[in-house]
């Protein structure tokens, strides 16, 4: 899942960009942005996205390139209003990314709710036993999909035999 997230973020972020994410996202995602992208001048701010007033204030003040959310979140299982956040985020020009790993596409379709990109850790819900590694990036934006595919091709972050 993290390789999929990494390919997406490399496709959209540039030095000086800002990522706003929930304060309870998966630790690996937080670590990826803070410790891998941080040295390349990518700023990260975390807030309680379940409180729309706090989220709105942060989005309007920071004007991030990416709003990253999980619903339900991992590990606290907090629920976030994807539609409301997407509306606010799009008003300030942010790309809305939803980690939909816990909900799965069966229970929630974030693209229908207004998200721009959906990511899944297929390690968790397809493998389930950490014996298969994988991730998915889904978007309706053909240009963005092409940029992510290039990152995956160029960096080799795709599933394949060893």
Region annotations inferred by a language model:
Residues 1-162:
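Conserved PLP-enzyme active-site core in the AAT-like
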């Amino acid at each position: 899942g993290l390789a999929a997230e990494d390919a997406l973020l490399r496709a959209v972020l540039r030095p000086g960009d800002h990522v706003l994410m929930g304060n309870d996202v998966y630790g690996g995602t937080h670590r990826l942005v803070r410790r891998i992208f941080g040295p390349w001048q990518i700023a990260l701010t975390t807030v309680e996205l379940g409180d729309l007033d706090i989220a709105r204030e942060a989005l309007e003040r920071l004007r991030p390139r990416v709003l990253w959310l999980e619903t339900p979140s991992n590990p606290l299982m907090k629920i976030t209003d994807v539609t409301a956040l997407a509306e606010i985020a799009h008003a300030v020009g942010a790309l809305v990314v939803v980690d939909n790993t816990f909900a799965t596409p069966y229970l929630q379709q974030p693209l229908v709710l207004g998200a721009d990109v959906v990511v899944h850790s297929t390690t968790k819900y397809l493998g389930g036993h950490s014996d298969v590694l994988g991730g998915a990036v889904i978007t309706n934006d053909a240009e963005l999909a092409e940029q992510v595919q290039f990152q995956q091709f160029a960096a080799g972050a795709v599933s394949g035999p060893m």
